[in-house]
Amino acid sequence: MDVLHELDAFVTWQGGFDYYFAHQEEPAVWDQAQSDLRKIGLSAAAELFGVARDLFLSTDHFTEEQAVVNRYLSDMRELNTRWRDYVPALHQALAHWRSERGLEEFGLKGW
C-alpha cells in the first residue's frame, strides 16, 4: 500500500501521471501500484493507470515535433482528469489501511 501513497502524492497532489512516471522510474513499482489498485477494488482506476503508463512509454519525450508534444499533453491531461473520479475511493482505502484494523488485515501490527 505504500506505493499507493506515493501514487496518490505524485498523481493527485503534484503533477499527474506524467510527473509520477518521470519520478518513479521502476516498472516493478508501477506493476505493484496497478496490482494494489485492483486489490482495493479500484479495477477501473488500475486500467486507467495502465493506459497512462502505456501512453508515457510509447511517447518520444525528446521529440521536437510540436504536434506530437501537444497530443501527448492533451491525452495525459484527459487521463489526469479522469483519475479525479477515483481519488475519493482511494483516499478512503488509504485511510482504512492506516487504521489499526486495516494494518491487521495486511498482517501488520496496528498502531
PLM region descriptions:
Residues 1-111:
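Extended, alpha-helix-rich binding/interface surfaces that flank or overlap catalytic cores
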